[in-house]
UniProtKB/Swiss-Prot annotation:
May bind 1 zinc ion per subunit. SUPFAM superfamilies: Helical scaffold and wing domains of SecA, P-loop containing nucleoside triphosphate hydrolases, Pre-protein crosslinking domain of SecA. Residues 846-897 are annotated as: Disordered. Belongs to the SecA family. PANTHER family: CHLOROPLAST PROTEIN-TRANSPORTING ATPASE, SECA INNER MEMBRANE COMPONENT OF SEC PROTEIN SECRETION SYSTEM. Part of the Sec protein translocase complex. Interacts with the SecYEG preprotein conducting channel. Has a central role in coupling the hydrolysis of ATP to the transfer of proteins into and across the cell membrane, serving as an ATP-driven molecular motor driving the stepwise translocation of polypeptide chains across the membrane. The gene is secA. The keyword Cytoplasm applies. CDD domains: DEXDc_SecA, SF2_C_secA. One of its GO terms (biological process) is intracellular protein transmembrane transport. Monomer and homodimer. Part of the essential Sec protein translocation apparatus which comprises SecA, SecYEG and auxiliary proteins SecDF-YajC and YidC. This is Protein translocase subunit SecA. Zn(2+) binds at residues 883, 885, 894-895. It comes from Geobacter sulfurreducens (strain ATCC 51573 / DSM 12127 / PCA).
Amino acid sequence: MFGAIIKKIVGSKNERELKRMWPVVEKINGLESQVAGLTDDQLREKTFEFKERIARGESLESLLPEAFAVCREGGKRALGMRHFDVQLIGGMVLHQGKIAEMKTGEGKTLVATLPAYLNALTGRGVHVVTVNDYLARRDSEWMGRLYRFLGLTVGVIVHGIDDDERRAAYAADITYGTNNEFGFDYLRDNMKFALEDYVQRPFFFSIVDEVDSILIDEARTPLIISGPTEDSTDKYYIIDRIIPHLKKGEVKEVEANTLSGKRKVYTGDFTVDEKARSSSLTEEGVAKVEKLLKIDNLYDPRHMEILHHVNQALRAHALFRRDVDYVVKDGEVIIVDEFTGRLMPGRRWSDGLHQAIEAKEGVEIENENQTLATITFQNYFRMYEKLSGMTGTADTEAEEFHKIYKLEVTVIPTNRPLLRPDFPDVIYKTEREKFNAVIEEIKGCHEKGQPTLVGTISIEKSEVLAEILRKQGIPHNVLNAKQHEREAEIVAQAGRKGMVTIATNMAGRGTDILLGGNPEGLAKQWRRANPDAPEEEYEKVLAEYRTLCAREHDEVVALGGLHIIGTERHESRRIDNQLRGRSGRQGDPGSSRFYLSLEDDLLRIFGSERVSKIMDFLKIEEGEAITHGMITKAIENAQKKVEAHNFEIRKHLIEYDDVMNKQREVIYTQRREILAGQDIRRHFTQMMDDTIEEISSFAIEKVSAHEWDWQSIGEGILKTYGFQIDIPPQTMDRLSPESFRTLLKEKVHEAFDAKVAAFGDELMDHLIKVIMLQTIDAQWKDHLLSIDHLKEGIGLRGYGQKDPKQEYKKEAYQLFMDMMARIAAETVEKIFWVQIAHEEDVERMEEEQQKQARKKMVFNLVDEDETSEPSKSKKLAGRNEPCPCGSGKKYKKCCGK
């Protein structure tokens, strides 16, 4: 209560933040008339003046009012758009390295230009991150007009461009691109063999558009570059054939003489836990599998891999549904994004799950891949000196943004008041009743001409609805999110009179729905259908569409604006809010309502018992609906439960990945130092000394030298350095571990000096560089596999009363130290044994090494829950197209040689 009184007096934290920024807005507004009086050239000259002032030590904060005023004026002249006062506040929040929550239609794309312009003046590069290539290209071209007008350069990173184009884009003052492209470029750079081949600059400032989607929804999604393993795929078909013989059971609680008075009994051959998305064999199931596969003990260490694949096959059959979790298209299993409903070709579940689903569907099974390089989005974006983001829905996840990314969320007020009423949820007992009600609602809106956007959570549900509408003769558009550009066009016209659009929840995000339609979009469609029409005819058509859309706009406003119908609640409240946010932009009228049933996944798995009891208590008959605050509260509690569970998963992932991140930093730093030629000889000398220490460990203190393990010492010296060491008996009597170490060190350094004299300093340094990189890359790849295996089994340590996280840290560190020792031993051994006839031999060796590395590369996005290594593309590149290996070279000059 005391806290509420204080809050009433001084305002909430968000209100205090906004209050602090209004004086700066007044200052910017005070400069507007002065800046408006400048010519275009004088305005552009301001950019160079700001850069000089920064070079002389002036801070960005002191420049902010002037820079924002110049950017605002540039927007008016280059784009015909003026930044509102609330957009100036949004720009300040982003510049401070925070998240700006701005409602749909408030102009987030334009807001980003303010901090991007200001920070680009440092010359250190600003990255603007979007969710897909279409938006990256669109925003770089659209906002690029403003930046170029003010004298800055703009680049865009999209799939399919080569390294030279990427390098040029990153060298620009402001670079647009997707989170995937930025992340993969980082991994690719750290697999290259020359610093001049790197495309990225050191990370400075990043503005992440749709920050909740990228930093939260995709946080469990590591980026992976992988290569195929050699394992046979027959095992997946064999195991898949036994699954139909297993009977699904359930868990029952029976009376028992235990502390709780109950005991769990498992029936059938396997049980399924939908909440945890897991399945497991019962004792009867284990016995049946052993009989079907003709093995004695499924839990024998030799058969653990079989047990793992049986469990994955069970999950494939019991938990993963066709046209919901994935689709089968052209003989391939393609994952459906649970948040957007988009197909994700190329993405694969990992750990044998994707192969199990391929076996279930009877399509060709692709080999599992082995990780060559990986990073999570969480760790990638935390490398930026300053990180900020914007979205329409961040406040519900404010705690996670703060705990994981140290990012504060500031809610920016809307430019005009929000007029959209969000009607209470309507709940039915069955899905059939719910769909009947949804169809009636759509029909009513369509008949009076009110545009309707219907949100579904899966492709399957959108197709069911579309089929019913088709049978009833109601014209509609269906968005299954297969093509971003087409998707944006359909969404842009969803506000036309009488339009019915069915879309998976997040499809078309980033595109405003204009009431009455978008005349430019309609004219663009006409231009595509009539490419040879003269320009004056196009202008005439555009003018007609503008008149039509203006008339329809007024009619749609009178009808109540865009009506949103949600057909199911998502696990996250934020996704529901995003759907609602498609309506009521910039003070437009609109409305929203969700239709639910007890058969919906969220209610069935997490909350149906309580809701069902309420409905029974209220004696709800079939066909009747209920609208009640208690029900809405129960649904919100179910959503909060799921959100908390998902937050724990993401937190758990980052705690484990932080261990890996430190190791990645060590390896990548060492690689960069080697590529830069920094202290290569010192690195190698340290490696030699490490191997000397290893061999000298056989010389034991307080034991006569005659009793040392001379066989192991001799084998170690011969294997590592290629020579033998003879010690006379009289010297042996006086030998101590320390004097032996000194003697061995002298001999090894003498042999190395002789090698340098024979090869020459320059060739030797080049050789060390090539062999070090080759060895580091090979050992790092194997280390990543070892870490994957460690992660898979570490949870079992909990049964031994040990903390799995601490055990993981300890063992991962030991694996890392073992890898570093192997890198040293292997590098030294190769240098001492290598024979070079000509300098060209080293160059050939380097070329072959690079070619092999490129051939192995497959670029993957992986969902960490089941997660994935996407498959190699089946499409062959043309000889002059960029090589699909990602090298940045043309195919004919790379893998097509």
